[in-house]
Amino acid sequence: EIRKILKTHNPSLVLAAMDKAGILSNILPGTTHKNIPILVHFENGNSINWITRLIVLGGADPTNTLRLSNKERREYKNTLKAIRMGNKPSAIAFEFGEIIANSYALAIAALTESAPPRDLEKQISIGSSLEFPIRARDLNSLQGKQLGDTLKKLKSIWVKSDFTLTKKDLMKNLNE
């Protein structure tokens, strides 16, 4: 099973052989093993995540082909969503948590063939520990969709500021 192969310490040779024999693309259409050795190098024996490796293989969405648990399916989809967002690892950690942020950073590094940030662990730790300073009760004049849209807008502004804006700064944005 592909999951077992991707969970091994270094699946590069097995995946290369499967790719050369046409087995890999038969199981997972459109995939290629070429970035897996790079990912394995960046993992450095730590944080082996078979979902990250699955994403780095590329190809068509495997969530209907492979038997994934709901948690694995969510992790796969959220990591892809994070890759499309293209934010700093701290912003991804804030939005999705540590696991997705780590997968995101390693996948991007492997796919772009460039090292992940040196302070990756620090960025992820910071992002995952942050709490958005605005609460719905702070915007008690708003309700329903307007409240949700405003919170979303303010959160986006806060993330783009690299989490530097204070509650007071964010509240000023309401009047602009």
Provide a role label for each language-model segment:
Residues 2-9, 67, 141-142:
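Generic amphipathic alpha-helical segments used as scaffolds and interaction surfaces in large
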Residues 3-20, 27:
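Loop-centered beta-sheet repeat module
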Residues 20-176:
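C-terminal subdomains that position terminal phosphate/3'-OH groups for nucleotidyl transfer/ligation
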